[in-house]
Amino acid sequence: MPETWSNEQIIADSLGRAADVEIGGSHSGWRLSRWRQFVGTYSLTGLPDPLFVVHISGKRNIKTWERDCWSERHSIPGLATIVPAGQSTSWLVDGELDVVTLSIATNRLQNGQARDQFDRMRFAFSDPLGVALTRQVLSELYQPETPERDVYVSTLVDALRAHMLRGPAQPGEAS
């Protein structure tokens, strides 16, 4: 293993298996991965880069550890979470975990607004555009590889990255 682990290496080590499917890499400044497996609880050390997570399907009522207990709030399929770089997390699944993660290289968060989107944990929030783009990318990744599909997936991921760097609406903001 390299001296500095990527988000995906840390997640794979914690879950005990690699992502089901993934695209992107260090050269592109992002990596999108799907994680599916049955799990009880798991913990992640602080990740080197921020993470946008979409709860795709599987177990409802996933919780995260907050201060000294499991969160009252829970995630269901269709909700999103942002995990900032460096923050350790623990998760209570007790069933099938099915999430997609988008890692964005910290050095790609150039302006203040982009950095601000990833400076704190946001658990189980509604982001219809981010979720829709993620689901569409995911469905395309299971299609046969063609040059046209690759261009389409790249364009969708660029749109998702632009959306994330601009930032999903915060609670209380006008839509």
Give short role names for the model-derived ranges.
Residues 20-120, 146:
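N-terminal regulatory/effector-sensing and dimerization cores
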Residues 115-174:
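Amphipathic alpha-helical segments enriched in hydrophobic/aromatic residues interleaved with Lys/Arg
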